[in-house]
């Protein structure tokens, strides 16, 4: 069965930070001197992010310290911030609501009734709870209680593409199979305290959001977005360059300065080989949906593949407006490109711990 991406839905927290507000908040995590504070604020200005949604915000306006109560200023240089158990408590409350909203929008966009869903794939790397987001979606939207569930957990920013691979594998020839893939990420629950370069980069980029897509069998319409293929590549000698680990005070990311260099040096050879398996060359790809791990990641992809900056415009827009929402981000980008009627074939690329490249071909 050819999987068709029949409808997308997205959801964001009610309130948002500006990047300048977050720089001020995070400066309070570090108890830093004026020199380091200038360095931190410069990093935030260069991040490509303008605003970010966060479930920790309780009010839209007013003084920053009155709008949220989850994070406190560091008491001293050894203060690690909220415990992971406290962060997971917020995840358990907020993630199901956000995911259910995105899933409902995707079903409406695809004009698919909730009772028609046969398979549900949930994706998240920013929290754990059981019963989980899947059960909340089934009960909240009235999906059949026989819906087959799979959770793709802790795979990082490319997780939604792994989720689509799972949905694609459900297509065993039955035209009645309808898959709902839903990603929800609450990255702002993992803001880190202290002065650590990797943590500073993560604090400057990541945000909250949820996105969903409905997959069904093709009906022969020429305007359908069909999955033409998927691929994956574990970059050699890169195990320590991007990591995501559970700590006592939040999940902690390692993001080395080598990541853009690795992408620029390793991506082209694999993409050329993968596209050839589908009788395509890089020049044949009409549009690109690239996960914006940050501005340098986008630039590295453009240089590696020899494509114009214009091909990353939607990715940069999503990064600026919403920040890096981990695995949900690529679905935000695909949703926007589909609404813009982006030309095909389209290739989606996302990167995660490993370092791993995941790819999706849409025809």
Features from the language model and the residues they span:
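Glycine/charged-rich beta-loop-alpha catalytic/anionic-binding loops adjacent to active sites
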Residues: 82-83, 114-119, 141-153, 193-198, ...
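Active-site-adjacent elements of ketosynthase-type condensing enzymes
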Residues: 24, 129-136, 181-201, 231-247, ...
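Short, well-ordered amphipathic alpha-helical segments that serve as non-catalytic structural scaffolds
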Residues: 45-49, 94-110, 210, 262-277, ...
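Glycine-/small-residue-rich "gating" segment that lines the acyl/pantetheine channel
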Residues: 144-165, 172, 186-220
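Conserved beta-ketoacyl condensing-enzyme motif
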Residues: 43-142, 282-298
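Short beta-strand segments
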Residues: 6-9, 123, 153, 178-185, ...
